[in-house]
Regions:
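Catalytic metal-binding core of the metallo-beta-lactamase
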Residues: 295-355, 359
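Single conserved hydrophobic/aromatic residue that forms the stacking wall/gate
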Residues: 358-367
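His/Asp/Glu-rich metal-coordinating catalytic cores
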Residues: 2-71, 76-289, 308-322, 338-345
Length: 367
């Protein structure tokens, strides 16, 4: 994309196109580069011995003097997971919203990068200047709180990067997507739109997250005489909030199990993105003081990950929790494309009734 003076705006995807995961896109104008997102992907079945897949950032290393920063749209692994690895080679500031920065800082701490990495919290509606670019953060909704779209102003024109999004007029936490701002930017004239297309080929529309909350509540009412185990994405803080709400309503204690689940819920609670009523949360060790119908376990493993808590429970490898006769297991997420077999394997190992409740996290096409 050329400006009249001959300078070019380059948009270089280093991952995330025509694949699930590893989202990272480079925007370059003259001597300025910004990088939107820095995610990882999970290995395919034939990638034996590989735990994670991270993007090839040779281009960034070769042009390190131009790189002004990473701008992150939200806190899912496929958008932030590669940061601790890439920052060791491309050490530039990171800009994101409050919860996203909190999740990033947790990763940086694990990799001893907190002191060497500059971070800045950006609010929705706020703009930052990085070299030739001005980047505006726009409020969107997604299956994780604090998601943002980006309006990237360059000398060549405006690029709108939606990030992952859905339109939810009744979100569990925070404001609705700022469609008015999208309209205002559209009137200015947009050079390019880079839009989330996951599920776009499906007819209909994505329901509000609160719809799943009603379904969860119904399952709690239906299974009042059994222990409930719910597997979901650790990052879906709104979903966890609704599970906790139902647990509190039906007088159940909540156990959070799985390392990533414990970490994310702790961060979200500390930053005010989740509200847990007093005396609702208990440790695994305290479970012995309650009967099954007094408990609900929120766990990782909704994607069939072999080392996740639910997978270890199903295989009788978990040190503290086993699936018991009479338990009800709820999968509150949809398998990511490619994970269907792993999820099926876990379900086959469960000796408990299984229920499904999920909601597409991305906007769909409309009739």
């Amino acid at each position: 994309m050329k400006k009249n003076n001959g300078s070019k705006l380059k948009i270089i995807p280093l991952g995330g196109l025509e694949q699930i995961g590893m989202n990272i896109t480079v925007f370059e104008y003259e001597d300025s580069i910004i990088v939107v997102d820095c995610g990882l992907a999970f290995p395919e079945d034939d990638m034996l011995g590989i735990d994670l897949v991270i993007p090839d950032v040779t281009y960034l290393k070769e042009n390190i003097d131009k790189v002004k920063g990473f701008v992150i749209t939200h806190g899912h692994e496929d958008h932030i997971g590669a940061l601790p690895y890439i920052l060791k080679e491309v050490n530039v500031p990171v800009y994101a919203t409050k919860l996203t920065i909190g999740l990033i800082e947790n990763k940086l701490k694990e990799h001893n990068l907190l002191r060497t990495t500059k971070r800045k919290i950006i609010k929705h509606g706020q703009s930052i200047n990085l070299g030739a670019f001005r980047i505006e953060f726009i409020k969107t909704n997604h299956s994780i709180a604090d998601a943002a779209a980006l309006a990237i102003y360059s000398p060549a024109g405006i690029i709108v990067h939606t990030g992952d999004f859905k339109v939810d007029y009744t979100p569990v936490f925070g404001d609705v997507i700022d469609l008015q701002r999208f309209a205002e930017i559209g009137k200015k004239g947009v050079l390019a739109l880079m839009c989330d297309s996951t599920n776009a080929e499906r007819p209909g529309f994505t329901m509000s997250e609160r719809t799943v909350g009603k379904t969860i509540d119904g399952l709690f009412a239906e299974h009042q005489n059994s222990r409930i185990i719910i597997a979901t994405f650790a990052s879906n803080v709104d979903r966890v909030q609704q599970i906790i709400n139902s647990a509190y309503k039906y007088g159940r204690k909540v156990v959070i199990e799985g390392r990533s689940m414990v970490n994310i819920i702790s961060i979200a609670q500390e930053l005010g993105y989740i509200n847990i009523p007093e005396n609702t949360l208990i440790d695994v060790e305290q479970m012995k003081n309650y009967t099954g119908e007094q408990l609900v376990l929120i766990t990782t493993g909704s994607q069939g990950e072999s080392m996740a808590a639910l997978s270890r429970m199903a295989a009788h490898l978990h040190k503290k929790i086993s699936i018991l006769p009479g338990d009800t297991v709820i999968f509150s997420s949809h398998p990511i494309p490619g994970n269907e077999k792993a999820v099926s394997n876990v379900i086959n190992e469960l000796s408990a009734p299984v229920s499904y409740t999920h909601l597409r996290a991305h906007e769909t096409g409309r009739n």
